[in-house]
Amino acid sequence: MRFAFGAGGTGGHIVPAIALARELKSRGHECIFIGNASSMEERLAQKHSLSFFPIKVQKLYRSLNPDNLLFPYYLAGSILKSRRILKDEHIDGVITTGGFVSGPVAIAAISHKVPCFLHESNSYPGLTTRYLSRYLHRTYISFEQSRPYLPKAKLKNFGIPILESVRDTGFSLTTLGLKDDRPTILISGGSQGSLAINSVVSSVVGELLSSGWQILWQTGSLTYKQFYKQHNGKEGLYIFDFNSELSNMMKKVNLAITRAGAMTIAELEAAALPAILIPLPTAAENHQYYNALAQKNKGVAELLVQSELNPQNLLATIKKVEPDKLRKALLALPANTATEQIVTDILSFY
């Protein structure tokens, strides 16, 4: 059978799609990817040998933005083009995993009477998911907190699909000039980075290093040069904007300080890595806060809201956190078999 994926915008939406596509391909099925041209989804699809078909999708901004005037035009065009792709490529099923690309692809599938499946990573489903889920064959959720917002008869909770590389690695910190036997913190605000997190970390990095921590600090691309110039060369510190081994680093550190995107949380769980979660306050419908709150309530992470983020509070939270206790709770979680379970369930419809 042939499946089409629609996802885009961020790695948190795209990586689950890649994981599901790889699993489907391993079972003998063919997969294509639909998304914006010259985008992260195009780069990742090509990296994993998935045929890519571009459409023009524009994000609908929640604030007053003149670009919103063009949204209906681009939406109609992207739906029509997606329908043509589904027809020309003889697609048997469509799988969407979020991001503004997923809406037009899902609508095209529904209108073309192609079975459609959606995976929602976040604990609070977005408007598109809440609207489309009633028309889908199945909606897969990752948090039990999502259930009240979606049609219960079509729901399955299998968790978040992750790539195999997160689960098993022989990676060593010595390749970064650090030691494998020292307590290590991973700090990341995402691929672009977080100025709020980076600025506070910049103020406390010296104290953390002097207290015995090693630090892996992903500044992100936007402020990398600024913080690299300030801190590069300090013993026990590896500072970088992007590293393809990031998911493997998680297996070698004792504590993470990160945002609370759903994909990040899934990778933290897969690596059994305790974390201090700092939700992005501008995330749609504040979903990162609810993601982080769910993790805190499970006893596997600490929550520090950005409005309370300052050098004193960050240091106090690091000192307060009990990594061994959190790791024990993480290890007690069921193994992540979301990818396999979702694919098996999808194939049961055929």
Please annotate each region the language model reported.
Residues R2, E30, S51, I110-F171:
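Active-site-proximal region of nucleotide-activated glycan assembly enzymes
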Residues F3-G8, R27-Y74, F158, V305-S307:
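Conserved nucleotide-sugar phosphate-binding/catalytic loop shared by glycosyltransferases and other
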Residues H13-L24:
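Short amphipathic alpha-helix
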Residues S39-R43, G93-H112:
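An aromatic- and histidine-rich active-site surface loop
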Residues L44, H48, F171, L178-A256, ...:
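Donor-nucleotide binding loops and adjacent catalytic segments primarily
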Residues L64-G93:
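An amphipathic, basic-hydrophobic alpha-helix
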Residues I91-G93, K251-A266, L273-P274:
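Acidic donor-binding loop of glycosyltransferase active sites
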Residues D324-N336:
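A short, well-ordered alpha-helix in the C-terminal region of glycosyltransferases
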